[in-house]
Design a protein with these regions (language model features):
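Secreted, disulfide-rich extracellular signaling modules
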Residues: 1-108
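Residue-level detector of buried hydrophobic side-chain packing
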Residues: 1-2, 18, 58, 100, ...
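Solvent-exposed coil/turn segments that connect beta secondary-structure elements
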Residues: 5-7, 21-23, 63, 80-82, ...
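Short acidic, Gly/Pro-enriched loop/turn segments at secondary-structure junctions
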Residues: 8-14, 28, 163-164, 274-275, ...
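Residues that flank catalytic or metal-binding motifs in active/ligand-binding sites
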Residues: 12-14, 54, 71, 85, ...
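Intrinsically disordered, low-complexity segments enriched in small residues
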Residues: 18, 99-192, 200-202, 220-226
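Low-complexity, Pro/Ser/Thr- and charge-rich linker/hinge segments at domain boundaries
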Residues: 26-30, 106-121, 285, 308, ...
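Extended charged/polar low-complexity repeat regions
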Residues: 154, 160, 170-174, 180-416
């Protein structure tokens, strides 16, 4: 937000419009007759009320995202030509100088209150491009169960915000819907808890001033965190409870984040439970999950990476399997389903981030032969020159499919 204050109270209600400046300009030489070009689109506006002094705010969120990438020419504040009165604003040389307010929130995952553009790659899954921050979340259904006693279905999630991490043995940027974690952070001198859900969204919890063992959810999802003697619980408004081990470490200025703790149990309002068991020597890797009907889904690992997920009725050759390839910084993940159908995921490495650039449903892979794609989604990113500290946002998505041997384009979308 850009915040400004008027110097004089206007004699009539006055509108102020905010526009993006399109070219560089010099504050020492700029004049009314020699101004840089500005956008024809209003970023925001406000109305200064007659005979009042007040602070006014302009929402410049979309511009701030461009500024992160280096394109910053500022904004122009002006009154519509139809206005008969005017409003004079304080400059940077006064006590009431203009200022910016930047508010940060984790928008890394999928939330119902955010807006996304979705792309289908058939069997390979669904991509979701955030229209707020350009982040990519890609989901792939691994296993499915039915029933009334908390059945367990496992979904793979790729999150481009986390694509510099391989914390769960699922590949860079990947986790499953069951890889839910809890840790502490030091923020503005206060210790807060961070719950990360199954698609990578971070939910921050701040201490309740009236109860030192309880924390409230700042994302306004009506979640309550409570620190007990043996564990930590998070309860939602439907009385569903998630249980985590105690996070005993305390973050410091030198180490502002603690290690993460994996979820142990999920319980619904009537007492049905899902129990998550971690690998003994790798506390963030899941060994097995037991649902409310005592059905056990197991995850198996080779060289630290998950190579298959088995439901109770499956064996090692007839389940969802994962194969990882890395040749000269060209990474590929193949997923093979129980029925032999396959999905393929390709990555580009940029500044330590493993960016998903293609997700495809393919015919069965044959070594030394090019894969035949049945459905495909490809992505392009900003900051491809990999400048450290700048985000990798989706700028383009293309969806194609094959019909009667012909490749057809279903969607071709640019994001700005």
């Amino acid at each position: 937000k850009l915040c400004v204050r008027n110097v004089y109270a206007p004699t009539a209600d006055t509108a102020i419009m905010c526009k993006e400046v399109l070219k560089d300009w010099d504050p020492e030489t700029i004049t009314y007759d020699h101004q840089p070009d500005v956008s024809g689109v209003y970023q925001d506006y406000c109305r200064v009320v007659k005979n009042q002094y007040s602070w006014k705010e302009f929402d410049v969120t979309s511009l701030a995202r461009k500024w992160y990438l280096g394109e910053n020419h500022g904004v122009q504040l002006s009154a519509p030509k139809s206005e008969s009165s005017f409003s004079q604003l304080h400059s940077s040389e006064t006590a009431n100088q203009p200022y910016f307010v930047l508010e940060y929130a984790s928008l890394a995952g999928l939330e119902s209150y955010l807006t996304y553009d979705h792309q289908s790659a058939g069997l390979a899954g669904t991509g979701s491009v955030s229209l707020v921050n350009g982040n990519l979340i890609f989901s792939h259904a691994d296993t499915a169960m039915n029933g009334n006693r908390l059945p367990v279905s496992v979904t793979h999630y790729y999150n481009s915000c986390d694509s510099d991490k391989d914390e769960f043995g699922m590949g860079y940027g990947w986790r499953t819907s069951l890889h839910q974690t809890l840790h502490k952070v030091l923020y503005n001198g206060e210790v807060e808890f961070v719950y990360t859900d199954g698609d990578g969204t971070e939910h921050f919890f701040k201490k309740n001033k009236n109860d030192q063992k309880k924390y409230f959810d700042q994302s306004e999802l009506s979640l309550t965190l409570e620190v007990g003697d043996a564990n930590i619980t998070i309860t939602d408004k439907g009385d569903n409870v998630m249980t985590f081990p105690l996070v005993s470490d305390t973050p410091t200025e030198d180490a502002p984040e603690t290690g993460k703790a994996l979820i142990q149990k999920i319980q619904d309002a009537v007492g049905n439970e899902v129990v998550v068991t971690a690998v003994a020597d790798a506390p963030l890797k899941i060994a097995s999950v037991t649902d409310g009907a005592n059905r056990v889904t197991t995850l198996h690992y080779t060289d630290g990476r998950c190579d298959r997920i088995q439901t109770p009725w499956q064996d090692a050759e007839n389940c969802v399997r994962f194969d990882y390839y890395d040749f000269y910084n060209e990474e590929t993940l193949y997923i093979t389903h129980e029925d032999g159908r396959m999905s393929k995921y390709e990555y580009a490495l940029a500044n330590g981030y493993h960016l998903l650039v293609s997700a495809s449903a393919i015919e069965k892979h044959v070594d030394q032969q090019p894969d035949k794609k049945l459905a495909d989604v490809t992505y392009e990113y900003s900051n491809t020159n990999a400048i450290d500290g700048l985000p990798h946002c989706i700028t383009h998505a293309t969806v194609t499919g094959t019909k009667n041997g012909t490749t057809l384009t279903a969607a071709n979308v640019s994001y700005t």
